Amino acid sequence: MDLDLQGQVALVTGGGRGIGRNIALELAAAGARVAVAARSRAEIEKTAQEINGPAIECDVSDRVSVEHMVKLVESELGPIDLLVANAGISIDEDVAWEIDPADWWRVFEVNVLGVYLCCRAVIPGMLERGAGRIVNVASGAAYLPGSESTAYSASKAAVHRFSETLANQLEPHGIPVFSISPGLVRTRMTDSNDDLPWTPPELAPRLVRALASGRLDRLVGRYLHAEHDDVDDLAVRADEIVENDLNAIRLRR
């Protein structure tokens, strides 16, 4: 299937740096018109200039801010075909009981409530048109043993479960929802970890581009890992993955 995204409108939150920036650049290179959003306009201006798209200030944990963001994108670019809910934060955490509860909860406000609010804001338009796709960026920290941050890992597990349940609700309407792990990509959030097996930064954008194209729609609701799941292999094995309930977080007995 052609991975050309000509004519599509995409919104990428957290699009000013790291994974979100790379995704925005990939989508724009594939022909999509892309808007990027972040809390600080200065953080996204460079990316917006490179993709010739709008840069929108938005606090994804604030409903009014999110709804305003979506209206701006729709007024400047048109109806949103693809949401990439990428904005996320982490905190330094040695032990959970020494963290300020407000700081701990803020991770959930951005990483979970933010994803929900962004989805909630774009879904009515997608339902009206009977088309659209949603990609929520989660993390392998949701299921890997030894995850060091209770706030971050728990929030990303919530994103996975939210995405799968939302996918079940939207599949009858023809709107696929996916959650992805971009792998361990060197970003400002992870840069303090020097001796880790970094994931090539181009893999997550490549996966999102394939999802945006519709090539992997059979895998609606699945959890896809940018490093461990090859796009071509996913397309070939899609029926097997669904029939055997693979690429899902389950309690196996």
What residue spans do the PLM features occupy?
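The beta1-alpha1 cofactor-binding region of Rossmann-like NAD(H)/NADP(H)-dependent oxidoreductases
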Residues: C58-M69, P101
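Active-site helix of classical SDR
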Residues: C119, S155
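Alpha-helical segment proximal to the catalytic Tyr-Lys
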Residues: P124, N168-P172
